[in-house]
């Protein structure tokens, strides 16, 4: 009778451990899979699509835009901003300043964009800065 009781105890422990082990493995797999999903959702791409869409609707309310066209415009905006920032950084370095001000941005826009486009960009930028300054006071 004693051997039967001893057999029962290890037998009852072994299946419990065995049943827990696969659950842990499955749980580990689930966490890894859900962890991957969480990582994917956390890595957001910042785009200008919503702003481009708003401007499009202001200019042409009945016109749509494809995803490919939106991607191209987003790349264009990123490229222009990168060029302006780079040029403004160079201008600040030439003048031995550590801060990029609106003056450096304005000058870099004049250097990068041609003719009338630069004039319009500068006037719109000045208008936006004025509007922002008046709203913060």
UniProtKB/Swiss-Prot annotation:
What segments bear the compositional bias annotation Basic and acidic residues? 1-10
Where does the record put the Glycyl lysine isopeptide (Lys-Gly) (interchain with G-Cter in ubiquitin) cross-link?
131
PTM text: Monoubiquitinated by the UBC2-BRE1 complex to form H2BK123ub1. H2BK123ub1 gives a specific tag for epigenetic transcriptional activation and is also prerequisite for H3K4me and H3K79me formation. H2BK123ub1 also modulates the formation of double-strand breaks during meiosis and is a prerequisite for DNA-damage checkpoint activation.
User: Origin, by domain of life?
Assistant: Eukaryota
Database matches in CDD domains: HFD_H2B
At what positions is Phosphoserine found?
Answer: 12
Give this protein's Gene Ontology molecular function annotations. DNA binding; protein heterodimerization activity; structural constituent of chromatin
Location of the Glycyl lysine isopeptide (Lys-Gly) (interchain with G-Cter in SUMO) covalent cross-link?
Answer: 8-9, 24-25
Main location class:
nucleus
Q: Which UniProt keywords apply?
A: Acetylation, Chromosome, DNA-binding, Isopeptide bond, Nucleosome core, Nucleus, Phosphoprotein, Ubl conjugation
Positions carrying N6-acetyllysine are: 8-9, 13, 24
Q: Where in the cell is it found?
A: Nucleus; Chromosome
Q: Where is this region: Disordered?
A: 1-46
Write down the PROSITE patterns for this protein, in alphabetical order: HISTONE_H2B
Query: Which GO cellular component terms are attached?
Result: nucleosome; nucleus
Q: What does this protein do?
A: Core component of nucleosome. Nucleosomes wrap and compact DNA into chromatin, limiting DNA accessibility to the cellular machineries which require DNA as a template. Histones thereby play a central role in transcription regulation, DNA repair, DNA replication and chromosomal stability. DNA accessibility is regulated via a complex set of post-translational modifications of histones, also called histone code, and nucleosome remodeling.
Provide the family line: Belongs to the histone H2B family.
- Assembly and partners? The nucleosome is a histone octamer containing two molecules each of H2A, H2B, H3 and H4 assembled in one H3-H4 heterotetramer and two H2A-H2B heterodimers. The octamer wraps approximately 147 bp of DNA.
Record protein name field: Histone H2B
The major lineage groups are: Eukaryota, Fungi, Dikarya, Ascomycota, Pezizomycotina
């Amino acid at each position: 009778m004693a051997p039967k009781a001893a057999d029962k105890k290890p037998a009852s422990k072994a299946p419990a451990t065995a049943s827990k082990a696969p659950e842990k493995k499955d749980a580990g797999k689930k966490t890894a899979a859900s962890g991957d999903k969480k990582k994917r959702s956390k890595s957001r791409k910042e785009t200008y699509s919503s702003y481009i869409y708003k401007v499009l609707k202001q200019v042409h309310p009945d016109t749509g835009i494809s995803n490919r066209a939106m991607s191209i415009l987003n790349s264009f905006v990123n490229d222009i901003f990168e060029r302006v920032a780079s040029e403004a950084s160079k201008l600040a370095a030439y003048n031995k300043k550590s801060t990029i001000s609106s003056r450096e941005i304005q000058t870099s826009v004049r250097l990068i964009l041609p003719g009338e486009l630069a004039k319009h960009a500068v006037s719109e930028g000045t208008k936006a800065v004025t509007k922002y300054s008046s709203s913060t006071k």
